[in-house]
């Protein structure tokens, strides 16, 4: 097969591992920076170009699109879809999962466990918003934040009001969530591939920190999932329409709660913590799925 990896960073661990795994299984693979692509959109022969070169037809595309380039990256991914190329995660699913509020709304409709979440526009609604999520302490999240950036733990009601007012004053979109104290600064990253969890790790926040992201100094260890946790992770990924997803769970007193569904989950932490060849599993999945239609979201684009 001829496989393209859409990535801005050929030197990044996840990109390198996908390239290695594809080559080990006998495939031709090329890393393509989506920002270097431009598109010819027409009814007869749509195409994608880089620096005057028309790209060849690929059998499959693996999107590794950073959040900062979601719009353009997904436009390029969608162009591949229009050309009939199999994409591991479809553009519509990537776009959907990048909208944190929409993700929460979709999962709540499916009955998937979530922290109580509030969203408002007017400062006058702040007191009621805080009450809705159970009062302080509570978590305030920028909808555009990634890797723990833009996530604040407000330990008192006064602090919560001040932070929410400040974000609203900056016209930043935020959501407010209940703080799951019993999680003790830990979450579980479930790596979902197709209809099963192929690897999972527990991420523990660094001392004095409540965010467990590895980019924030958290540590990762192997974890054994319960059947319910596996089921919730797979259902969350399917709700987003993702074939590959990193689903972050919190263990609460009333069962697993989904914090986030990531459409471009990193491989370094999960492979390091579990010792599993996740990159190889992804390529094996593509080998089986690339020729199947219709795709998971049921529509191209």
UniProtKB/Swiss-Prot annotation:
Entries under Pfam families matching the protein: RimK, Rimk_N
Binding site for Mg(2+) 2: 260, 262
Entry GO terms, CC: cytoplasm
Enzyme superclass (EC): ligase
List of residues binding ATP: 141, 178-179, 187, 211-213
Cofactor descriptive note: Binds 2 magnesium or manganese ions per subunit.
Residues engaged in binding Mn(2+) 1: 248, 260
Annotated positions binding Mn(2+) 2: 260, 262
Keyword Nucleus (UniProt): no
UniProt EC number: 6.3.2.-
One Gene Ontology term of the molecular function aspect: metal ion binding
Family to which the UniProt record says this protein belongs: Belongs to the RimK family.
Binding sites annotated in the UniProt record for Mg(2+) 1: 248, 260
Signal peptide: none
Cofactor: Mg(2+); Mn(2+)
InterPro entries: ATP-grasp, ATP-grasp_RimK-type, ATP_grasp_subdomain_1, RimK, Rimk_N, Rp_bS6_RimK/Lys_biosynth_LsyX
Identification of the protein by name: Probable alpha-L-glutamate ligase 1
GO biological process, one term: protein modification process
Keywords: ATP-binding, Ligase, Magnesium, Manganese, Metal-binding, Nucleotide-binding, Protein biosynthesis
Gene name of the record: rimK1
PROSITE patterns: ATP_GRASP (PS50975)
Entries under HAMAP family matching the protein: RimK
Ranges of residues in domain ATP-grasp: 104-287
